[in-house]
Amino acid sequence: MHSRRAALAATTAAATSAAPRVQLLTPESPPQFEATRAIFREYAAALGVDLCFQNFEAELAALPGEYAAPRGALLLATVNGELAGCGACRPLRDVDYANACEMKRLYVRPGFRGLGLGRMLAQALMDHAMRAAYSVMLLDTLDDMEAARGLYVALGFEEIPPYYFNPIAGAHYLKAELDGGARPTTGRMRL
C-alpha cells in the first residue's frame, strides 16, 4: 500500500510539474506563413467584424509585408509545438505621433488562454519596438475585449483619441511611450 501511494504521489508530482513548453518564433518558411494566415483569419473571425477597411486580405497575401524585419515583427506562439497565438508590429506613418509603430493581430487561441501568452507576445513586440528605436507604440482594440485592454494598461498603454478611421463602434485607441519612463515588464524575450 505504501509503495502505491509513493508511486501515485510521484506520478502526480511529475504531471503537475511539467510546465508547458512555450516558444515564440518568427515565421520564415512558406508553411509558417500559411499557419500565420490561418491564425490571422481565426483572429478576424473571433472579432466578429469585417476587417476589409484595413485591407486585410491584401495584408495576408503579402505576408510578411509591413511586418518584415528590421522595422516590423511577426510572431507566432507555440505551446508544446502546437500553434497557440500570434502578434505583429509594423511602422506607422501619417499619424500625429513621431516615430510610431503599431501592435497588430495580438491573438491567443481560446484553449491556450490563461498561460500568459498574450503578455509574452505583447512584451516581445514592445521589446522589438524599443530595439528598433521607435518612440511610441499605438494599437486599437474593441470595447468587448476587456482582458486585452487590462493587459495593455498593465504594460503601460494609455487611452488616446483615434489615430486613424475605424468604422467599428466602440473601438479604443491606446499608446505606450517607448523611449523613456518606467513600465512594468515580465522579463525580456528575444525574437
Describe each PLM feature range.
Residues 109-111, 115, 143-144:
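Active-site acidic-Proline motif in GNAT/NAT acetyltransferases
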